[in-house]
């Protein structure tokens, strides 16, 4: 999936591409995904449990189209020796964040939106059907749910609170008494 996050110049908060095919060869899938990422200019968050797509992008020189693990999903252990881009799909934190991202998206952008009195958009019926049948305990056959959730996780920006510094101008600049000299 490809997802438009907030943008003043384009439709926002909506999926713009659904890839619902299972080609016979993994390289065909990887090439299709690479072409879509290049065409749309979107970086992708991929599962890094299987290194094939990451290696394919690196081999072709397009590894800048792969996102690293989002900061808000990092743990102290995940920051150590992370060389592979993407995100592990077997981490409980990631599984929960993935499900919550889809749940929040459905609540905020699909169907009737109570606060605004309007109706949200989801143009891909196969993804809607996949979401309806999704079981968090058995995720293997829900490719569209997994890819749409990864797109949402990749688009999330978590606001990092600024820490107030203890900067004190009086301590920083030393003041000397002014003495006048008369000749």
Would you name each region that the model predicts?
Residues 66-112:
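Short alpha-helix plus adjacent loop in nuclease-associated cores
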């Amino acid at each position: 999936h490809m997802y438009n996050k907030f943008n003043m110049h384009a439709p926002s908060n909506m999926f713009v591409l659904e890839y619902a095919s299972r080609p016979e060869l993994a390289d065909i899938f990887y090439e299709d995904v690479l072409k879509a990422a290049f065409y749309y200019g979107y970086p992708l968050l991929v599962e890094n449990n299987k290194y094939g797509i990451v290696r394919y992008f690196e081999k072709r020189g397009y590894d800048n189209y792969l996102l690293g693990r989002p900061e808000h999903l990092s743990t102290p252990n995940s920051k150590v020796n992370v060389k592979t881009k993407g995100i592990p799909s077997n981490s409980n934190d990631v599984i929960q964040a993935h499900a919550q991202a889809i749940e929040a998206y459905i609540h905020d952008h699909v169907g009737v939106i109570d606060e605004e009195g309007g109706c949200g958009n989801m143009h891909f019926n196969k993804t809607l059907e996949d979401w309806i049948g999704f079981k968090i305990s058995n995720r293997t056959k829900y490719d569209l749910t997994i890819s749409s959730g990864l797109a949402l996780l990749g688009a999330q920006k978590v606001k990092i609170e600024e820490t107030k510094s203890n900067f004190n101008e009086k301590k920083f600049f030393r003041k000397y008494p002014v003495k006048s000299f008369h000749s």
